[in-house]
Amino acid sequence: LCRAFLDGDAEKIQKHLTQILGRMISILDTKARDEQKENFYHGLLLGLLRSERDWLIRSNVESGDGFCDILTEPEDPDAGMIIELKYAATFLELDGACEKAMQQIRDRRYDEALRNDGRENILAYGIAFCKKRCKVVCEKL
């Protein structure tokens, strides 16, 4: 999973996350108000990314004009990743939620903290979750 993030392979990330969600979680795990459901997926993804011990992984980092969900600095001093998560109420809303996440990354300039650290090879991820499914999009900033 971590290799797929580093490679910018949104399709592989989506496949791995969907398998993990299907095998590990219960729909009851996200039993909360819609505006709080994202928190469960945020914590789950932080735990999964932590398996890469040499990465600096930070949550809710102030960058640009806001706070990005997850900011990751891999071993490569030029590389960085921004991950913005969204919860979609229905499966049909997954694509739109991903685009909303990506637009938020661009509009709020979440890449600023990484660029200030001298990182220029930055990947942005918009990930939307709905129950045991997800959609992942990636672009190079």
Where are these regions (language model features)?
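Domain-level recognition of nuclease-like catalytic cores that cleave nucleotide substrates
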Residues: 113, 117-141
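Extended alpha-helical interface modules used as scaffolds for assembling large macromolecular complexes
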Residues: 1-109, 134-141
